[in-house]
Amino acid sequence: MPETYALFDTTEGKFKAKLYADKAPKTVENFVTLANGTKTGKPFYDGLVFHRVIPNFMIQGGCPEGSGRGGPGYMFADEFHPSLKHDKVGLLSMANSGPNTNGSQFFITVAETSWLDRKHAIFGEIVEGYDIVQKIANSPRDSSDRPKKEVKINSVAIEQV
């Protein structure tokens, strides 16, 4: 089975995530089809922003409104693998508003966040460019944790090797 990677190009630099297609197949399929545009007719994440950044916690993106309230127009069920825990930095996980409300929003941890286990589906981890993720997390932000200077996702390319 080929390994799947997501290559993030942002206004702050590039980073790469390995996607866990073997442990979270539905979640990875959703992310990949949004990223490459097969679900929406155009690459969904291109041009969106990281709308929430919290040092020592996470960075969050994937909202088409840039507010944290938007999504792709559908929701799907949680997918938890018993071996995946929020026990390290650099994990790629689905943001949601409760059980089975996953859509397009995701976050990347910059701390151990074990209280999120079995609440947010982990579907990958950063394998290159974690310093860029950390830089985004440490961006100056307003009282709503929104970066004062917009941090844009220029593109998310999917690579299979």
Predicted regions located by residue number:
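Cyclophilin-like peptidyl-prolyl cis-trans isomerases
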Residues: 1-161
